[in-house]
């Protein structure tokens, strides 16, 4: 089968266009959250300061903004080294005709923030994003009398505490968020993982990839029968491609059937990549190239 793929040649014209470099100046970039969010830090690390940026309340709003032409790029968290992948982002990538064109990894350094004059013993309630609460689980387990409430964003939690001016409230967010909203750091070492990092993806509505892109993300659906996943993974093995990640999400309304998300090394111009994608397309359902970056 794999010899046949090679004899037939590789996939024909790709639906993606190669570009020398992504535009990183004078572009419109959207991130989810408020000023001081980790997404904003990732945006600045990737694009710099010569951009026009704005923020939205939810992740789907960010993808909607680029789909509607309000922004050129969106910055979204996709995976954390402690809490794992962000499942909702994977689902949203399928609902919108948007594509990954870059990634940025930043270190996450959570702080416990409170109103000026507040003390650790004053705290009764703590607010943050659900991922941040998970990342600080061991610390929070030492304070079981605290009520935990998940909000849409870590910086949004800092903003709430600042607006309420209640010394019994605290937020888990970055030091930058604390400075932005005038909060004080009540405790610093609150994350059990000293190298806690989050990978953010840069998303566009353009099917483009940089000439030196070296990672590809795809997704596909498989029937629930013996050997189906093994057969798909064989395309990576026989084309000598290094798969760096695989995740699965249940298919709505189809018990015990899954959609798989795979990251592997390569460039869409590589013959081995084209052969593998062709083989996967023939065996899997609803295969989509999410991006090459």
Per-segment meaning from a language model:
Residues 1-293:
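Domain-level signature for soluble enzymes in the chorismate/prephenate branch of the shikimate pathway
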């Amino acid at each position: 089968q794999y010899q046949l793929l090679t004899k037939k040649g590789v996939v024909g014209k790709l639906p993606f266009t190669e570009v020398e470099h992504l535009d990183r100046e004078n572009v419109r970039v959207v991130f989810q959250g408020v000023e001081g969010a980790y997404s904003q830090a990732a945006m600045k690390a990737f694009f710099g300061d010569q951009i026009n940026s704005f923020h939205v309340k939810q992740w789907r709003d960010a993808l909607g903004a680029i789909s509607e032409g309000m922004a050129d790029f969106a910055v979204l968290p996709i995976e954390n080294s402690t809490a794992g992948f962000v499942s909702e982002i994977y689902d949203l990538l399928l609902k919108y005709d948007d594509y990954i064109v870059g990634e940025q990894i930043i270190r996450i350094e959570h702080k416990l923030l409170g109103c000026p004059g507040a003390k650790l013993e004053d705290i009764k309630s703590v607010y943050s994003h659900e991922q941040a609460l998970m990342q600080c689980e061991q610390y929070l387990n030492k304070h079981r009398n605290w009520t935990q409430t998940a909000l849409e964003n870590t910086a949004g939690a800092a903003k709430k505490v600042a607006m309420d001016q209640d010394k019994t409230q605290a937020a888990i967010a970055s030091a930058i968020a604390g400075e932005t909203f005038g909060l004080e750091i009540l405790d610093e070492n609150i994350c059990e993982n000293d190298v806690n990092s989050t990978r953010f993806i840069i998303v566009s509505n353009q099917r483009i990839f940089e000439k030196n892109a070296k990672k590809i993300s795809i997704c596909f659906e498989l029937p629930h029968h013996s050997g189906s996943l093994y057969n798909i993974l064989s395309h990576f093995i026989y084309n000598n491609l290094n798969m760096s990640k695989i995740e699965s999400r249940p298919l709505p309304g189809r018990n015990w059937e899954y959609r798989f998300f795979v990251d592997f090394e390569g460039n869409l111009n590589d013959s081995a990549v084209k052969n593998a994608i062709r083989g996967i397309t023939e065996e899997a359902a609803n295969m989509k190239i999410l991006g090459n970056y």
